[in-house]
């Protein structure tokens, strides 16, 4: 079937086109109708209004025209007609995808894409890479490369032992063989042990090169590992890179191990290799025979054999390098003591610790001094590293006893001057050896650090603060000289003969000059310290602190005032939406159950708080805000501010476990404002600044109050010191008067007795009629005292009357003058054990010639008055029951207990501090000493604390301070009728009734108001 022209499939075009794309035989003229041509011609002239170009007649022609515009050139052939061969038809067959090769794609460099049409001779476009900067860069780079190569050539690498002994070709061959090896030998934490050496020799029996991989401590110093491998094995390191080593066995290598038994026929018959059979030569047999034969030299010199691994009879001769290592280890032990001859391990022989002296006269622990900035303890990494270093070390000492190791301690300290670690082996076969006791004894005697300990070995580290004996002795000598010169300069004494002998003669004059300068320095230092510690200096310093605190407080108040001026909170809207009580009840109930809430922190209310409220109101009608205020009134103030600024309706302010919950309703006609953050409130940063400044002002107020109290106390102390100095000068004259009175007492004892007993005549005789009125006046002061207090005073009066006849007249005169000054009010409540009860009555009388005592005596007597003031009474059974219930309901009980020693001084001090905040205390008496009754412990506690016994349980007692439980006890009494006996803080407490407002706050208010 023939298709029209526009239905024919186009051919795959090559890059070049012939002159005529469509041969005349492909398109028959009979099939082209005029109708189609006219339609085609009409389609040809259709074009856009802007172009007005004549389009090609077909799509193929348009594609060809596009390819010509892209740079493809047509190939011109001589023959007008060309037949397509089979190859070309195969290449350009219909349906084949044309994939261009890289050679067929045009290469466009970046430099050649620049349009050169605007280039002129005066301003030519530079070629890519021909600029001055890039040319200079390439030139400098070439110079740098040449210099680097020259330096590399100048550095002559030191050749290794393998490079010096082996030819280069053989060395390259061995390195190639070693690098291709897949099996490798790992050197672990223990280092190059005999097992590693044995493994290397076993591999050398089959291969001439062994690849070794170092780990842990061995890789930290590869040069050291390199040398140790060559020393212990006798091989050559032919290549080393990182932690890998290629070890060559050598040219004339022989397997070094042999069996120490004389009968070698069994080994020969066991089918060993020829190499193994040729190892044991005549020289080795002779050495074995000589070592086994008994001789004097063999007893003195041990054969240099090293036991192998895997068989007890397998040994080898030590290499020269190994002998050198043993000699170095043996050199460390020279001069430390006798050797342990029955040593079972490798050389060198350790020192026998049992042969060292058990007790060294005048032994002292070594002096230590830690460098500045160094931590005394070892870190975990340091401990691990030192422990790993101590494992391959040879043993320095062998020990079999547990105690009396002073001689061994001296030897260890000497060893520490050469080696940081000391390794002690525990002797085998010795009875009752305990490595733990040994380690503790040595650690205490030497002051070192225990690194590791087991049943066989003990490793001790000398520590970071270790000093050699020469350095420590020099430091101790210098300190001793300094102490001697300080003592001589302070006390002004001359040095003794022994101390003179201590000082070296060469530096005697220098020490004297230094001592003189030090004496002057000490005197000036003492003078300055006295001036600093004087009350005047302390008062001046405190005044300066007070002025600085006041200045800081003023600055804080100024900043707070500025922040308050910036904030202008809005007033609540008068005409706002209201809600009914039922709605408020339901909203409150829903709000308290809400899980999402806003937390109000230390910043308080600021613009971000209101923004968060509006964001909450976007999804819910209520918002719950938690604030940590101290009172419900403060929470209500915060709620009012939130209500006014947000425009919501305050529902409730309730107390919850986290603080106070403020619930705000957005309202039924809520509209979200355009600006969520109100401009009348502070920002987040300003709110934090306000909180910090308020806290600073509060702390400065208390600091100012404390400093002002200190200044008042210092002023009072200065006045008392001046008064004491005056009374001290008057005391000398009074002592003269006392001496005269004592002389008169010898001559006129009866008159002196009458003068002494002037104030106590009421105790010995019945009062006369002239004294009845005075007794009636004083009767009102004696009546309030209870019966127990009267008995106490009678006992005291008896003891005082017995001392009165033996006392001095001056003491009685001073006591009378003191009581004359204090007055009757203080005398009624003052119970001094040094005076009888009736002396208070006589003290109220105005005695002629009575002089007032000094201020220090009055203050001392007042302190004794405060100690003995307030004799407590017992509680009723009902009060005890109520207080017991209240004590047992306490949730947080402080752990008070009486110990085995029955000393209650510290417990009483703690109870007094506890009673300042809590009215009740529970004391556990179960742990008291055996044979001590509970009543005795209770009596001690009551005497020390002044508390009341509420209840005595089987293992505990309940104490009451005497006041503070009235509010709680009201719930137990009907009609809130609390007995008057509970409300007697003046007679039942050893501490004043605490006010509702703290004293510090009251003093701060007084200071602020200028009162």
Swiss-Prot record:
One Pfam entry name: CRS1_YhbY
Molecular function per GO: mRNA binding
Sequence segments annotated as region (Disordered): 77-96, 721-810, 841-872
Sequence ranges of Basic and acidic residues compositional bias: 77-90, 743-757
Domain CRM: 164-260, 376-473, 577-677, 873-972
SMART domains assigned: CRS1_YhbY
InterPro entries: CRS1/CFM2/CFM3, RNA-binding_CRM, YhbY-like_sf
UniProt biased composition (Polar residues): 722-736, 762-771, 849-859
Main location, first listed in the record: plastid
Transit peptide region: 1-45
One GO location term (cellular component): chloroplast
Phenotype on disruption: Albino seeds that germinate poorly and die soon after germination.
Start-end of Acidic residues biased regions: 772-782
GO biological process: Group I intron splicing; Group II intron splicing; mRNA processing
Location within or outside the cell: Plastid, Chloroplast stroma
Entry keyword set: Chloroplast, mRNA processing, mRNA splicing, Plastid, Repeat, Ribonucleoprotein, RNA-binding, Transit peptide
Oligomeric form and interacting partners: Interacts with RNA. Part of large ribonucleo-protein particles that contain CAF1 and/or CAF2.
Function in brief: Binds specific group II introns in chloroplasts and facilitates their splicing. Acts on both subgroup IIA and subgroup IIB introns. The substrates of the subgroup IIB also require the CRM domain proteins CAF1 or CAF2, with a simultaneous binding of CFM2 and CAF1 or CAF2. Can bind to and promote the splicing of the single group I intron in chloroplast tRNA transcript of trnL-UAA gene.
The protein, known as: CRM-domain containing factor CFM2, chloroplastic
Organism: Arabidopsis thaliana
Organism lineage string: Eukaryota, Viridiplantae, Streptophyta, Embryophyta, Tracheophyta
